[in-house]
Amino acid sequence: MIDVLPAGSFQVEGADSDAECLVLVNSKEANSVMAEEDIRGLFEQIKVDAEFVDLSKETVFDYTGYDNIVFAMVDSSLLGQTAYEILDWVQNGGGLMVYFPPQGDYFFRSLASQMGVQESGWEMYEVPGFRFRTDLMLGGQGKDFIIEEPFESAHTLSLSDDCTVHMVSADERELPLLWQRQYGDGMIVVMNFGIMGKAYRGIYAAAYSLLNDAFAWPVINGSAFYLDDFPSPVPSGTSTYVERDYGISVGDFYTNVWWPDLLELAEKYGIYYSGMVIEDYTEEVESPFVPNQNTQRFQYFGSALLKNGGEIGLHGYNHIPLCMEGFDADFGEGYIQGTYERLFDYDYWESEEDMRASVEELIRFTEDLYPAVTPEVYVPPSNILSADAREMLVREFPQIKAIASIYFEGDVEYTQEFEVAEDGIIETPRVISGCVIDPFMEISALSELNLHYVNSHFQHPDDVLDEDRGAASGWEAMRGRL
């Protein structure tokens, strides 16, 4: 059962409250624009009330009434004498965070010694990955996190002994990437990292928390393991890798190998699965929708899932996303029309009435099979959900309390933040997926564990059939990596 908090309890304080942080940006610098977007998204989640000053438009501002200041610009010389005055302010008890490495010019070098920099080179450093020297982040210490597409993002430098280094590059050099330094009565925190984005928010939140003796923000403290397309019709016949490793049909593999293994993992790690029902894999998009009469496996798997503490949710009458033609017409700048048709071999729904009828049939099917269950979570097929369909779900199906799609922006997918939307729907995105957890997902999982105290994962039964999702390695290897 999902308990819903009022939407207002998740919102940042109103504009009439005093901002605790001043963020200095420059809208004429690409990195600064990226950082501002990053900071706004982060601060909304950790409930920091901040004021932003664009140094390309105003260079005279009052910084004395804030607890903390964030530098998020490439050219720090825009600050002029104010930069030294801010350092004096820090010395008297303020907090200063350098959000990304500024331009390594003479002006910044004149400030760097106060930030703990002993020596600095002129070249930038390609960070192959990172590791934590301290226990700043849960699950971070003692492991290397690899960056799949590194670039020259960090200053080459060495630090004075009075710096506490939390994060370094994951190589022999161990270049300092995140450190703090007590400066008089205040604190300076430097992110010499230069890689930003949603996947790294938890690291930046942890860095910001170092500015003060104590810092708290609201967290969810929860974990979710979604089984998309489960229960669902089981494919007939066998598959290349199941036949290779087990010599049995896909149906027998699911029943006798895959599902028992998942139950064993659930018992070992205290996992409760959320199974998202697909009634049929028909391509029908016009009502009336024919009920699936072959329910034996639905009853077997669904009952076992519920018996083991799991939940049943809604995925689709079929696996066609709830979208009508033209749903992506307003996707905005950067989106190429036709992307949906190019990437996905799906038909469009004929009308909103047809979409509604398909969900009605799915709910009837699910509640007939599991009378004690009222499904409250909806997962969009292929994580795609049109705005019209979302509005329809909220309006027509009040039993749906949460929508679980994805956290990171895709091509046409429904992207979410962890929040309660204005219409009361709980947005609960999934962060990682599948059995092959790649380096990006490892970083994302670490970040979200520390930002929201959340783990949110989904997989499909047919992952083991799909070479792109690791099937060639075999289920034993996939299970081990999971």
Give the label of every model feature segment.
Residues 20-26, 90-92, 100-112, 267-386, ...:
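Metal-dependent polysaccharide deacetylase catalytic core of the NodB/CE4 family, i.e.
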Residues 54-58, 81-84, 173-176, 293-302, ...:
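Alpha-helical scaffolding within the catalytic cores
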Residues 196-198, 214-311:
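Active-site beta->alpha N-cap acidic-glycine motif
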Residues 28-105, 256:
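Helical hinge/lid and interdomain linker segments adjacent to catalytic or ligand-binding clefts
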